[in-house]
Amino acid sequence: MEEIYAKFVSQKISKTRWRPVPSGSLQTTETFATGSWDNEENCVSLWSIGDFGNLDSDGGFEGDHQLLCDIRHHGDVMDLQFFDQERIVAASSTGCVTVFLHHPNNQTLSVNQQWPAAHYHTGPSSPSYSSAPCTGIVCDNPEIVTVGEDGRINLFRVDHKEAVRTIDNADSSTLHAVTFLRTPEIVTVNSIGQLKIWDFRQQGSEPCQILSLTGDRVPLHCVDRHPDQQHVVATGGQDGMLSIWDVRQGTMPVSLLKAHEAEMWEVHFHPSNPDHLFTCSEDGSLWHWDASTDAPEKSSLFHQGGRSSTFLSHSLSNQAGVHQSLVSSWLSTDPAKDRIEITSLLPSRTLSVNSLDVLGPCLVCGTDAEAIYVTRQLFS
């Protein structure tokens, strides 16, 4: 892999996202967005990856990511998603959801639309109204789904002032993240280790399926769906474990993979090469998981700068009887036969790596050490 380039940006980065390339386009992405948190003034920013430069004083490569534009954001940026080429949706710790519009002609961002009280607490234990953080968003034009600390799920449509659908008491605990399983189904993860599937075609406030971690009810912080096999879902939790789920069968994960030493903040399947998966953690690490069958001799060791530590996997379900070619490499991982290769992508441990995104050969991540890291050569 080409060197990973760092740029120090004087703000803690909570979210990083590549701008999608137009469908059918052969170009690689050039632009990414970031959101910040825990700063005196937070903002949403757009960057161009530009040229990569020289060695810095620490011996690392200094990236020449150019700031295109930024705009103030009220509250911490809890999540960030591109809605389309021009619009970015941001979730705030104030409970507000904002759509920002990028104007490429003069390189500015403006507020395009806003739902100021998408998430809020009510009831005897809170004032008659108090804001609740919006913790996660997912977009599928023209729809935006949001989840929050208030256990509420909202379905918004761009250009509609009010929510199209709200499930007020979707969860009695905090919802941490959401993604589409297949339209109009979504999957959410919560603070008591549950993965729930919701179908917007059904009325009422009950999920159509609940899966959960057995035992300790470890909070789940992140979720992603396999881009080709929509029944395969990955989650990461407070204990740093990576869980792989098959929502067609059972109520527990298919496999649990021992991973980070602290909270896993994000997990992403590579959108066009989903045998590759990426995770980042509070422990300051960013990992590339390779489950592809054509990888060289698989090793059960985790490689990082000459050090290795053992890698643990145990499968919780038997895949017998399922035609092997139809089984995702993530479901067929038998530790006795297959190995998943894990590579640490950052040159050294840092403060929390809060967010990552992958698109084509490009990866970006953001940290509490006020740095953004980028590589454009993931698989070389």
UniProtKB/Swiss-Prot annotation:
One of its GO terms (cellular component) is nuclear pore. It is found in: Chromosome, Centromere, Kinetochore; Nucleus, Nuclear pore complex. Transmembrane segments: none annotated. The modification N-acetylmethionine is found at M1. Gene3D superfamilies: YVTN repeat-like/Quinoprotein amine dehydrogenase (2.130.10.10). Keywords: Acetylation, Cell cycle, Cell division, Centromere, Chromosome, Chromosome partition, Kinetochore, Mitosis, mRNA transport, Nuclear pore complex, Nucleus, Protein transport, Repeat, Translocation, Transport, WD repeat. One of its GO terms (biological process) is nucleocytoplasmic transport. PROSITE patterns: WD_REPEATS_1, WD_REPEATS_2, WD_REPEATS_REGION. Coiled coil: none annotated. Its main location: nucleus. WD repeats lie at residues 8-57, 72-110, 119-166, 170-208, 215-255, 259-299. It comes from the Eukaryota. Component of the Nup107-160 subcomplex of the nuclear pore complex (NPC). The Nup107-160 subcomplex is required for the assembly of a functional NPC. The Nup107-160 subcomplex is also required for normal kinetochore microtubule attachment, mitotic progression and chromosome segregation. PANTHER family: NUCLEOPORIN NUP43. This is Nucleoporin Nup43. It comes from Mus musculus.
